[in-house]
């Protein structure tokens, strides 16, 4: 029997490297149809495939969410400590909370009223624009200085955007919305130039950054497009990508990636683009952040989604460790362990809500660990894919152990 309500929040699968690992979605589906959407690849396989592809949708239970945040000790479960510590919650991970479903159902609006009442810090990720012209929403947003809004825009090319981002307002409309938020005296507007796609983003990316800055964006976050070559959904979209990019995208990624399966372009390909972005952000007065594992050391601080260092995000993650090492040359486990132990030390890895624990090998290895134990294991096993060493491809180097046998990492990148 299908569940009446969608179950959210969940833990991000990038928990080891995420400043907002508690991520929330209003709906089980998204009315937008972006060809690059990783959620589409993730949800469009296995048992949920039919309901996702047919755009069947369920919303969260507003009453359940209110109980979680009103009495976290009783109703918060694994998220109780995160809520009690009032860490920033990421809203909009797998779906857009301001999409067409919200326009007809209004579940996000109900929750916004509640979160404003309790003054809870939030970071939104969206491509929608209509809510910035709706007084019901803007009356709640105005003056709410602990609500930050990220607007995803990957190109100024209206035609390419229309083809790739089906059902999404034009880049200009999104810039207009960003400007309305920037002028609302809230927690800031951020340009989310993700995913950055060579051939689609490259012709206009510097103009896009300048335009966002002129509209009031105070930060930008970026990440290169990754190709999941095992995804049948993405394979079906490849002819469209090839036409828009002007080259064989899959062949390009296979040639310039060092991995197989999930293809990420190598550092040399990305370097000139990231350096151009950072230089321009410094010129126009925007903070710069890289969510990509490559060149994350260029971030202004330890929240790669673009939150300033004054915000109450989790410091228990590798991006923070990278910033510490960049400043002090070395970083130690005790430098980041407090938030890890407080926020994710109270539940077992195997039971982490929304986290990928399906691998039999991982189950056997981590079955008895808490999530905090798992993160410490990653820290101390540099050959693991999510270790600081492997994730950043040697920018953090293990150089020894402390008195507790935890690895010490040294910064190995540009200052």
Language-model features and meaning:
Residues 32-35, 39, 113, 210, ...:
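A broad, structural surface signal
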Residues 1-148, 156-158, 180, 367-415:
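Conserved Radical SAM active-site core
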Residues 49-51, 212, 234, 303:
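A generic membrane alpha-helix/interface feature
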Residues 17, 26, 174, 187-189, ...:
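Functionally constrained cores in energy, signaling, and assembly domains
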Residues 235-415:
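C-terminal accessory extensions appended to soluble enzyme cores
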Residues 66-269:
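Conserved AdoMet/S-adenosylmethionine-binding subsite of the radical SAM
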Residues 8, 12, 19, 28-31, ...:
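Generic serine detector
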